[in-house]
Amino acid sequence: MSREANPFKKMPTILMPDELMAKALRRGEKVANEMRQKELPWLLKARFVEEHKVRTIASVVADNLQKVIDKTPPVRKLPKFYQEMVEVLVGIDDFKKSMGAFKWASELVRKLGNEYARKIRKARTPQQAGKLRKEFVGRVKSILEQIHPEMAFVAVAREKLKDLPTFKDLPTVVIAGYPNVGKSTLLKKLTGADVEINSYPFTTKGINVGYIGEIQMVDTPGLLDRPLYERNDIELQAILALNYLANLILFIIDASEFCGYTIEEQINLLKEIKDLFKAPIVVAINKIDLVDEERVKEIEEKLKEVGIEEILKISADKDIGLDELKERLKKIAIKEFLKDKDAENKELEC
């Protein structure tokens, strides 16, 4: 499945039992009024009116529930990133169980509609036809009340899931590093265009997305910018979900320390991210125009000591080293993207 759009954007508004029943009864009454205009024998007309009422109510309720099913993607067929988001935000098992309740109710209401329509056709009096229709309405109300908790759950889930960020199915670089190290400036300089801002769970700042040709660059303010011990379990899961998005991590170090964090603190965060993500890491030492060469060499040595091999020296502000960085990111991200796609295809074949 393509990641061209958030797969939950098309989920329709979830009507609660009273709302859905009111809608169905209004539609049923409208159809009944049309039927009452027909010139028919009184018993035949009574059957005709009540049968069409029942069929209309059944159709409105069953179709509405089925529409929710049809417009909601099967979770297990989603890209891993979105599967993780469903698990973090609402729980996959609870979500699937609730969608199952919609299916059960839709099928049962449709079946009952057909059964009661047949019974009404055989009614011996208008009163009997009306009684059967009322009985049917009562059973539909009971079914909807039975799945009320699941309807409420899916309504809340929809609100959370429809605002998930939209990512394209492209080689993706996720940018990390402490606040004020130059991530936003670098993203704008590398992509050379307006940056899209997407919402993301557990951060009020949103996710910034830009593109270098066919490379997707994702900046995550509020997520990969502080130590993991400051996170709760759900925030950690939201961060871990990025594992399924990132083909490459670009970690920014502020050589000047003007960001307010020492080199040691920045490298400690880098080590945490290195342990957390399976994607390779490129480190860009930023603001090299503000420190001497000796200081940059010291930082390079410290990075090599923690196992970082891909190190580039840049100044996002002064446009130093950005072309080389851009080319390295493209080359590595595309290579890793193709490798990940190959692994996904092999997984599907098994």
From Swiss-Prot:
Disulfide bond annotation, renumbered to this chain: none
Query: For GTP, which residues are the binding ones?
Result: 177-184, 219-223, 286-289
One Pfam family of this chain? NOG1
Going by the entry's taxonomy, the superkingdom of the source organism is recorded as: Archaea
Write down the InterPro entries for this protein, in alphabetical order.
Answer: G_OBG, GTP-bd, NOG1_N, NOG1_Rossman_fold_dom, P-loop_NTPase, Small_GTP-bd
GO terms (molecular function) for this protein are: GTP binding; GTPase activity
Q: Where is the OBG-type G domain?
A: 171-334
Could you tell me the keywords of this UniProt record? GTP-binding, Nucleotide-binding
Q: Which family does it belong to?
A: Belongs to the TRAFAC class OBG-HflX-like GTPase superfamily. OBG GTPase family. NOG subfamily.
Q: Which PANTHER family match?
A: NUCLEOLAR GTP-BINDING PROTEIN 1
The identity of this protein, by name, is Uncharacterized protein MJ1408
**What organism is listed for this UniProt entry?**
Methanocaldococcus jannaschii (strain ATCC 43067 / DSM 2661 / JAL-1 / JCM 10045 / NBRC 100440)
Q: What is the lineage of its organism?
A: Archaea, Methanobacteriati, Methanobacteriota, Methanomada group, Methanococci
